[in-house]
Amino acid sequence: MMEDLKSIIRDIPDFPKKGIVFKDITTLLQDAQSYQRMIDLIAHRYVGQRVDKVVGVEARGFIIGAALAYKLCAGVVLVRKPGKLPSETFSKTYSLEYGTDTLEIHRDAIKPGERVLIADDLLATGGTMAAVVDMVLSMRAEIVDCCFMTELNFLNGRSKLPAGKVYSLLNF
């Protein structure tokens, strides 16, 4: 079943720059049965656990996070680029391969003690998710897991995340 889903994701060579093979998930998302199966398989892992909020990371994490929140009867929290959220925010600046980036979350989005599932489409180097984990922990929430649709194993991004709190449906 996983191989069926993996086969739907197309490789785009030299995107966004030469030497990179981009995993294009849009082919899976636009196929209704495959998208539903992907969400169901990830959600199944958390059925029976208390999940209060699902955090979706801009932008493709919204696609997965909102669907998981619906399946798990949880609220949705958005993590966005600076200036995109209308109320007071916490922000986190983190290092990229070349430079830095910043993410924001509403200050009142997560209450202390809430159990939070963080969702994104892809785990690559782990830098973005590590920043989100720091923000969620600073809000005194408990992380259920960091879950991903896909993971690029050779980049070892999970080493930057809490041990035992990483789940990827499809590994490349």
UniProtKB/Swiss-Prot annotation:
EC number per UniProt: 2.4.2.7
Keyword S-adenosyl-L-methionine: no
Chemical reaction(s) catalysed: AMP + diphosphate = 5-phospho-alpha-D-ribose 1-diphosphate + adenine
InterPro entries attached to this UniProt entry: Ade_phspho_trans, PRibTrfase_dom, PRTase-like, UPRTase/APRTase
Glycosyltransferase as UniProt keyword: yes
Pathway annotation from the record: Purine metabolism; AMP biosynthesis via salvage pathway; AMP from adenine: step 1/1
GO molecular function ontology, one term from the record: AMP binding
GO CC field: cytoplasm
Superkingdom in the source lineage: Bacteria
Annotated GO biological process: adenine salvage; AMP salvage; purine ribonucleoside salvage
Cellular compartments annotated: Cytoplasm
Main location (coarse class): cytoplasm
Keywords recorded for this protein, A-Z: Cytoplasm, Glycosyltransferase, Purine salvage, Transferase
Sequence similarity: Belongs to the purine/pyrimidine phosphoribosyltransferase family.
Assembly and oligomerization: Homodimer.
Function comment: Catalyzes a salvage reaction resulting in the formation of AMP, that is energically less costly than de novo synthesis.
Official protein name in the record: Adenine phosphoribosyltransferase
Organism field: Pelobacter propionicus (strain DSM 2379 / NBRC 103807 / OttBd1)
